[in-house]
Amino acid sequence: MTFRARHLLGIEHLAPDEIRSVLDLADSYVDLNRRTMKQSDALAGMTQINMFFENSTRTQSSFELAGKRLGADVMNMAVAQSSVKKGETLLDTAMTLNAMHPDLLVVRHPASGAVNLLASKVNCAVLNAGDGRHEHPTQALLDALTIRRAKGRIQRLTVAICGDIAHSRVARSNLILLGKMENRVRLIAPPTLMPPGVGEFGCELYDDMKKGLEGADVVMMLRLQKERMDGAFIPSEREYYHRFGLDAEKLAFAKEDAIVMHPGPMNRGVEIDGTLADDINRSVIQDQVEMGVAVRMACMDLLARNLRAERGRAAVGVMA
């Protein structure tokens, strides 16, 4: 099993064989999580601190559950009551936590690159749970696992990513991962929600849902991130749904066995029809939630293995 990373900061730093290693190990954790006894000792004796500078009940709960099932001591840092709110810088917080000798830091931050900066200042492994518009690596990995289990492979597929591309770190991480795994990627969005320069990733760009969905194996819908918008990016939610919301009529242009994905939380009736989101024959949205726990377990397990090996080499060096 190949995984060389010291931290997991983005998909851009992972090679295809490392991505496959994460997915293969995550597959075994899916099986574990379906048992009555869902416990592993992969992180026994290790401390995991979750630092979420943005609210995210779903992702934080997934990381917390993943750590506990691996046997870690898990602490959720209450950022709203922390010294950060009193004026302490992110680096000061990082140095303070580093002095407590944690083993894993799971960090979500509204500023792109903030997690990379923090990782450069601590001695433990750092896992990016989403930073600004930059990356959300575990979301892309769990999406890849969901696709692989549904389609039997994660190569040579046509994947349509639809919605608010401009503000989405999920879109960026998926675009990088799917490209590394030799898939054909289409981005579908109104011009106001299509970021400049995105075509450099080798994807196809569309502003027409029906044309973009034609022959797609996978349809991945994205939430309108109104909290990141500082202007009028769409005429109205009603008009947006009419042109870019996924319903049965538009999905008919994709392949007959195309799967429907959404990273959540969903705005039903805005980016996706509620009935379609709940269709067990097409939607794998709940599968994505399940795969999320398994993928995060795999990522933390692999990072912990590398951390233990690094500390072992350091101890041998001191003894020598």
UniProtKB/Swiss-Prot annotation:
Pfam family, one: OTCace_N
InterPro entries reported for this sequence: Asp/Orn_carbamoyltranf_P-bd (IPR006132), Asp/Orn_carbamoylTrfase (IPR006130), Asp/Orn_carbamoylTrfase_sf (IPR036901), Asp_carbamoyltransf (IPR002082), Asp_carbamoyltransf_Asp/Orn-bd (IPR006131)
One GO BP annotation of this record: 'de novo' pyrimidine nucleobase biosynthetic process
Family annotation (PROSITE patterns): CARBAMOYLTRANSFERASE
Domain of life from the UniProt record: Bacteria
Record carries keyword Magnesium: no
Enzyme class: transferase
Binding of L-aspartate, residues: K86, R169, R223
Reaction(s) the record says it catalyses: carbamoyl phosphate + L-aspartate = N-carbamoyl-L-aspartate + phosphate + H(+)
Pathway linked to the protein: Pyrimidine metabolism; UMP biosynthesis via de novo pathway; (S)-dihydroorotate from bicarbonate: step 2/3
EC numbers, comma separated: 2.1.3.2
Key words of the record: Pyrimidine biosynthesis, Transferase
Binding site for carbamoyl phosphate: R58, T59, R108, H136, Q139, G264, P265
Signal peptide: none
Cellular component, GO annotation: cytosol
A GO MF label: amino acid binding
Complex formation: Heterododecamer (2C3:3R2) of six catalytic PyrB chains organized as two trimers (C3), and six regulatory PyrI chains organized as three dimers (R2).
Function: Catalyzes the condensation of carbamoyl phosphate and aspartate to form carbamoyl aspartate and inorganic phosphate, the committed step in the de novo pyrimidine nucleotide biosynthesis pathway.
Similarity comment: family membership: Belongs to the aspartate/ornithine carbamoyltransferase superfamily. ATCase family.
Annotated protein name in UniProt: Aspartate carbamoyltransferase catalytic subunit
